[in-house]
Amino acid sequence: MAWLPAAEPPPLSFPEALAAARGGNESLLAARAEVRQREEEKKAAKGLYFPTVSFAPLYTHLNDDILLDLNPIRDVVLKLHPQVPPALVPPFEDTLFKQDMLRLPLTARWPLFTGGRIGAANRAAEARVRDAGAQTRQAEEGVLRSLVRAYFGLRLALEEKAVRAEVLAGLEQHVRDARRLEEEGLIAKVERLNAEVARAEAERQFKRAGHDVEIARAGLANVLASDAAVGDPVTPLFVAFDLEPADRFREAALASHPALERLAAQRDLAGEAVAAQKGAFWPEVFAYGLYEMRKTDLSPIEPEWLAGVGARIELFDGGSRLKKLAAARAQQDRVKLLDQKLRRDLGTLVERQYREAEKAREQYAALEATRALADESLRARTRAFEEGVGTSLEVVDARLAQEKVRLERLAAAYGFVNALAELLEASGQGDRFEGLRTSPGTIEVRP
């Protein structure tokens, strides 16, 4: 049976890759699972406001029945009234507890006052939900950055391979021209050898570019959490020329960065921890009740049901409450200091990434102008060589110079794309990436 060749994976656009990464990345899925966990914990915390009702069946076996024996009193009564026949006076005894007892009690307990601890627990649960939500946003930003690096890294590797292939094809044609001119006696043997050496080096670089493509493809598959081969990226590299000033990105970072949102949630969480520890100094007041469902084994002195109000006051705990309160206040101080540092770090990070994007954009613009000169130089050197007035080395140098400009131009575009993704992550605006990529002020970069 002949094996059919494996089907080529379909081309992959960046929006498709982003949807796949957000749907399959384990770190992001774990962050979303934590949000669901915190949501359920928030619902569970609301149950603290309600009474708890429990059912605890008990079977007890005693060594004997427990009796209430009042016969000594009966004897005294008979002595005081000798005219009464003893047979007419029943025994003064009763069974309080049988040897075998089955109890089916329903018990209830309802907190009435806890010093604010239940409210603090609910507000803390809400803060944990917000913390998990901000963490998920942070994970989404990280997935976008990783995908940009991997997706456009593969695109860059494919473009570089295409450039290397064109250079190799051009040098192979140059070798053929050199051999023909050598046979015609128009150039020396050394000129043909120079062309063949350059062709061999171009072939080596082309093979190396092929390996780089496979490495980049494996990296993209890892980001997409895909065990299958991934298709070639069809979204080209780009450079956006309509970025707003750096101050706008800095303001956005300080207003809505998910790391700051996490610290805000943790600040609230620390505040609720302080409130809960203060509440521990107050008495706990609760209502309680009991109802016995099996009444046959009840003793004459036991009620079928009871209800009441109780209180619990912690008189001494070895200073534990004071230390826990101090720890909660220290946590508040810690979060406040972390917030100050993060705001300063975000401002610096935004400024650095903005400058990186500007540098890459300027490099691209300069190389775009240089590319036309390199193309014209190669045409002139090739024409001069074919006419016998130029050397093979000049043609090779011109072609390699053209290749260098083309590759550096692609690398500058890739550097811009990466810097843009990191700038948007630093400012908490990862969701703007697609909008900037397709904006009117953006140009697509091809070899």
Where are the regions a protein language model picked out?
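Small/polar-residue-enriched beta-strand and adjacent coil segments characteristic
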Residues: S13, T52-Q138, E261-L342, Q353, ...
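Regulatory alphaC helix of protein kinase catalytic domains
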Residues: E8-L18
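A short glycine-centered flexible hinge/capping loop motif at secondary-structure junctions
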Residues: E182-L186, F385-V389, A426
